[in-house]
Amino acid sequence: MVKDGAVVDRGVNLAAEYCERLDLAILVSGLGLEVAALVFDMVASGKALHIWSMGDLLHDAIAFLKVCLLDGIVPLLDMDAECELAQVIFNTGLPLHNRLRTLLESALAATNSVPAITAQHALCEEDIVPLVYASMSVMFCSTTLLSNGVDSNLFESIRRSSQALLRSVFELHADQRTWILEEILASLVKLPAQKRAQSVHRVAGGKSV
């Protein structure tokens, strides 16, 4: 019993340490997204024209948005709710949930700012590709963990914003349309679908196509 008790205590300590690190990572990511949104707004408004390195800043902001969505937020929300890691993360109390909500709010602000840039500036392929994959990762996220306390309406707003972003890229960059369509179709065929009505299927947790 003493040994088992020690194992339990060690597990609790490891879980607490992991959540502390996750909390810090979420905080830093949220701050980075706020900076990215600021860069997007400055570029869209023309206030950044006098900054000689703004092209590099814009590229870095787009890359950061892609990493946060594709490699951070989406994998976190796509985890199986029954897995041990998910239980460790989402059973630590309200503070972490609040931090996640703040991160999602920052992601929404950043994604909302990008379409204005794509409409006004000719982005290079190096920037278009990460924007497309960032948008698609959100659109096809199953969000199985949103029922554990993270605001599902907030993430749905991010999903709609990502769709608008992808639509703007698709409309303005004809030379990129073929591979974008191929990636969308490849993502669709991986999702479970249930036919509800003629020519209408439900995929990705209830999304209609």
Predicted features, each with a name:
Residues M1-V209:
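Eukaryotic alpha-helical solenoid repeat scaffolds
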